């Protein structure tokens, strides 16, 4: 069953038509590389598929409840006004687990002052849920992703406001990888990565359990990751 279907999509800026009559569909675990010459409208098509831009023709249908993550080529505006550090931004992905953690700490404090079998049972249930949902692993995941994307440990406390545009894009990529959306759309994800980080990302995406759409000028990277290719041609 398709998680996304686009029918007869077209987009124009004034009289300048980028593309027309684009029809595609995505199944779960598809890994699609979107290719085409510069200026053909690849980014515009990604925005339309992600629901971030209304195409001038056609329609896009997405599965109900589909979680979607989108990596822009530049993420400067994504973090405008945010005062988090690099590590704190990663922690936002796990807000639910952190609330559970705080609840468990409160139960522990109460148990230390006034023990009761009922309270101990409640703590046991909370601990089981926390473990089941990955509560004892999420900080390990964060460290793995940050190191993989080239952030040394001494950079994790750096405020987002002090990062370069390329570093902010890497932070956004890391956050998306931790969020694990069902559909992950990546526009030139290797642009701000060194060779080691590109290789790490390649391995991560090859193991990805969701659906991918990737635009990349690195055809070797695409060949290693995707199992389908969409080619966008200039509008006639």
What are the roles of these predicted feature ranges?
Residues 1-236:
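ABC ATP-binding cassette signature C-motif
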């Amino acid at each position: 069953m398709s998680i996304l279907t686009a029918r007869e999509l077209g987009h124009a800026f004034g009289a300048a038509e980028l593309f027309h009559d684009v029809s595609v569909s995505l199944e779960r675990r598809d890994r699609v590389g979107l290719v085409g010459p510069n200026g053909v409208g690849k980014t515009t098509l990604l925005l339309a598929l992600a629901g971030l831009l209304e195409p001038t023709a056609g329609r896009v249908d997405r599965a109900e409840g589909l979680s979607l993550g989108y990596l822009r080529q530049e993420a400067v505006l994504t973090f405008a006004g945010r005062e988090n550090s690099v590590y704190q931004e990663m922690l936002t992905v796990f807000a639910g687990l952190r609330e559970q953690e705080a609840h468990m700490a409160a139960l522990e404090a109460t148990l230390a002052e006034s023990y009761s079998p009922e309270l101990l049972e409640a703590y046991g249930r909370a601990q089981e849920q926390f473990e089941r949902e990955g509560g004892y692993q999420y900080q390990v995941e964060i460290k793995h992703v940050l190191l993989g994307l080239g952030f040394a440990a001494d950079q994790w406390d750096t405020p987002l406001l002090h990062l370069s545009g390329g570093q902010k894009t890497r932070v956004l990529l890391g956050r998306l990888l931790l969020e694990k959306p069902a559909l992950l759309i990546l526009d030139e994800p290797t642009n701000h990565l060194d060779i080691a980080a590109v290789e790490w990302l390649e391995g991560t995406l090859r193991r990805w359990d969701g659906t991918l759409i990737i635009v990349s000028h690195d055809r070797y990277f695409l060949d290693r990751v995707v199992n389908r290719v969409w080619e966008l041609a200039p509008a006639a």
